[in-house]
Amino acid sequence: MIILLFFVDQIHQRDLNEIYQRVAAKLQQEDSLSHQKQRSDQFEKLKRGKTVLEGMLRFLSLSKSNIKPDLKDSMDYRKNNIMNFLNMQSLRKTVQKLQLTKSEIQPMQQPLSQTVQDQSHDDQTTLQMQSMSMQGAGSRVQQIRQGVLQSLEIGTPGISASPLLPELTSPDGNIINPLTSTCGKSSATELPIERLIRAMKSISPQALSSAVCDIRSVVSMVDRIAGSVPGKGSRASFGVDLVAMTKCHLQERNFMTQDGDHEKEASDNPNAIKCCFIGRKALVIATSILLVW
């Protein structure tokens, strides 16, 4: 027990000695400044505190054998005073550390908050740019769809909008390519015949029938514009060659102008007129047959 008390006294003496050194240095600094100015209250407080610390250190440095009998009753009181003083100093030091830590944290919080604000602003800007790009992409897709519909309705005469269009357009408005949606193979490595077979398998029979009818109507329309010739299929829709018929009409007109004088001479004879007309028609038919062959 005596060794433990001695060890505790040594710890208290070390703490008091450290406080005494700081107070003595502060008092010396105030004393050097007081030569130029009047002594302040701080100087007097430091001086009294130094005197108290010196008394505490002397009390702790006393040996048990040198303690007078009249001082033994006041030993507990003095030790309690020393303990209270050290506790107050420890509490003050803790408060100072907390204040210092708080003052260091506040400047760090300001750049952190500024960084968070900048990051949130950058995120908002990125979201706005993404929404704008998505809106632009949607408008471009809508323009492409409208252009395709207009080209089918206006640019291709004689063809109607077949049921292929709904199958190439999804319900949400996005354009779907049946060639790429039915198979993961890239269209760049596929043969045209493979893409055609896949497209034929992916559409319904009604859509395929409508597409075939549209193709037939276009081919028939082109043949009729260019002129048909005798034969089978769509090229024989008129039954005669338009070019040959035009030449026959021109030759018939020439014959009519040449036979004008003969008709005047035979105007009084009905049989002559009838024979002339039959002969001219026979000549036109014969010429047409020769041109066709």
Curated annotation (Swiss-Prot):
Where can this protein be found? Answer: Nucleus
Any one Gene Ontology MF annotation carried by this entry is: chromatin DNA binding
What species is this protein from? Arabidopsis thaliana (Mouse-ear cress)
**Top-rank lineage group of the source organism:** Eukaryota
Listed name of the protein: Probable mediator of RNA polymerase II transcription subunit 15b
Q: Where is the signal peptide?
A: none
Primary location: nucleus
The subunit structure is:
Component of the Mediator complex.
User: Per UniProt, which keywords does this protein have?
Assistant: Nucleus, Transcription, Transcription regulation
Q: Does the keyword Nucleus apply?
A: yes
Q: What exactly does this protein do?
A: Component of the Mediator complex, a coactivator involved in the regulated transcription of nearly all RNA polymerase II-dependent genes. Mediator functions as a bridge to convey information from gene-specific regulatory proteins to the basal RNA polymerase II transcription machinery. The Mediator complex, having a compact conformation in its free form, is recruited to promoters by direct interactions with regulatory proteins and serves for the assembly of a functional preinitiation complex with RNA polymerase II and the general transcription factors.
Q: Does the keyword Transcription apply?
A: yes
One GO cellular component from the entry?
A: nucleus
Q: Say which family it is in.
A: Belongs to the plant Mediator complex subunit 15 family.
